[in-house]
A protein has these predicted regions:
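Pre-Walker A (Motif I) flank of P-loop NTPase domains
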Residues: 33-39, 63
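Pre-P-loop entry segment of helicase/translocase ATPase cores
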Residues: 1-35, 91, 96-121
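A short acidic, amphipathic alpha-helical/loop segment
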Residues: 50-54, 81, 136-140, 162-170
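Conserved helicase/translocase P-loop NTPase motor core
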Residues: 115-145
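Conserved RecA-like ASCE P-loop NTPase motor core of nucleic-acid helicases/translocases
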Residues: 42-83, 90
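Conserved helicase motor core of SF1/SF2 NTP-dependent helicases
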Residues: 61, 69-73, 129-131, 145-196
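Short secondary-structure boundary/capping segments
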Residues: 82-85, 139-142, 190-194
Length: 196
């Protein structure tokens, strides 16, 4: 679907002590009705905790979730969020390129399978680079494209638009999360012809 800016009506979500799950509930409702939701906010506004709460509701329903971001650090920070701790402890969180340090940092996270698939009630955490490998001819021939009930594209302001479009195709529902204060992706060309 194309976004028509005349119809773009973002809704500001604020924490309400009377309804502490109000923000995540609104996002879950939007995903159920629209199958896509964009969440943006500056640092320190609780995006990671809110995302973890949304993911938790999908996992509780036995659904599959994939989270992708530019850097491993962002994935680890999300995995550490309180709403996801029971899944980490239960061995229901997989991550691509899981290092020894990450295993120590977040005990219970397991290495992702080569096909980047997860069973119902589990989450895959992959960098944008690793997740984009599912579109390689070799992986598509071997495994086909994975499909997730929810795909979460974190740090979307740093991702290329083509990556967002490709990753969105992997999910039934798509949650796009970004910080409008972050810089967009930077491409450096070493060819002097383009550096004028």
């Amino acid at each position: 679907p194309t976004i028509d800016y005349d119809e773009w009506t973002p809704e500001e979500l604020a924490f309400d002590e009377q309804k502490p799950t109000g923000i995540s509930d609104t996002i879950i409702d939007t995903l159920a009705n629209e199958h896509c939701c964009i969440v943006q906010g500056p640092p320190g506004t609780g995006k990671s905790y809110t995302i973890a709460s949304v993911i938790s509701s999908y996992l509780d329903a036995g659904k599959t979730v994939c989270v992708t971001t530019m850097a491993n650090k962002g994935l680890i920070e999300l995995i550490k969020q309180k709403p996801l701790q029971k899944y980490v402890k239960g061995g229901r969180v997989s991550k691509t390129n899981l290092s020894i340090d990450e295993r120590k940092q977040v005990s219970g996270v397991k290495a992702a399978s080569a096909d980047l698939q997860v069973p119902g009630g589990e989450i895959l955490c992959a960098t944008n680079y690793q997740l984009s490998s599912v579109y390689s001819e070799k992986k598509m021939t071997l495994y086909g494209l994975p499909k997730y009930d929810l795909i979460v594209i974190e740090e979307a302001s740093q991702a290329f638009l083509t990556a967002i479009v490709a990753f969105k195709q992997l999910g039934v529902d798509c949650l796009i999360v970004g910080d409008p204060m972050q810089l967009p992706p930077i491409v450096k060309l070493n060819n002097p012809q383009y550096n004028s």
